[in-house]
Structure formats: structure tokens, C-alpha cells
């Protein structure tokens, strides 16, 4: 969830408490935690999120632009913990306003809150549908290729 939002050890403890022994495989990326595979919880400095998001039912992250866009491109609803960074707060608010996920403030970062909000997201077909629709809209916009074409067109 990014450096400084939630301390790595607290994130690990709370996420494990929320999802350990559940039917979900949990992947935590953190260079501040030691690599670990314990039942359904897997920790490493990095993961190939492109591959993981193909199978994901929920993406919990800090609200950075890359995380948010990757989640949407894969049509995955999101649970965002933005901390105090404006960009992340704006992104989290946008996800919630478009019904593609929910926000958790730092003071709400407890296993109970995470589990309750995660269940709400995964049980509401509208949030899943909204995340998928936003992802299709992003793809249709053209991405980096369109920007490059427009730059070339403007320079000619």
C-alpha cells in the first residue's frame, strides 16, 4: 500500500487477521517485510500484478495512479487506503464515487473494517460491473499510443 500509508508490520498483521484461513489467496507486496508463504497469505517484495489481477476479486492498495489504473484495466473492484497524499485521496474518492470500490481511512484500518468492506464490494455486483465498465472506458480512450499519435500529429 505504499510507503508511509500504513506501516508494513501493521499492514501484515491486519490483513492476515482479516483474511488468514479464508478461501482467498492473499498477496502482499512489500520490501519492508520478509518473504513468507503461510497458508493462504504470500508476501514478497514484488508480484506480477498483471497476472494476479487476471484472477483477482478485490485489489487493496494505497490509491496511487498506477495501482488504480491497473485494477480498473483488469475490471477488479478496489479497496483503497490513501493516507494523506492528495493524489491518492482524489483517486480513492473517484473510485468510490464511480461505485468501483470503497475507501478506508487510516484510522479505520482494522481487520473488521477491511473484512466488512471487502465483503460488501465482492457481494455487490454493481461495484464489479462499475470496475469492469471503467476498465473498458480506459481501454477505449486509447492510452499511451493515442497520446504519441497526437504528439506526432501536433509536431507535423
Predicted regions and their residues:
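Short catalytic-loop micro-motif centered on adjacent basic/acidic residues
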Residues: 1, 79-80, 104
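A donor-sugar binding/catalytic signature common to diverse glycosyltransferases
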Residues: 46-94
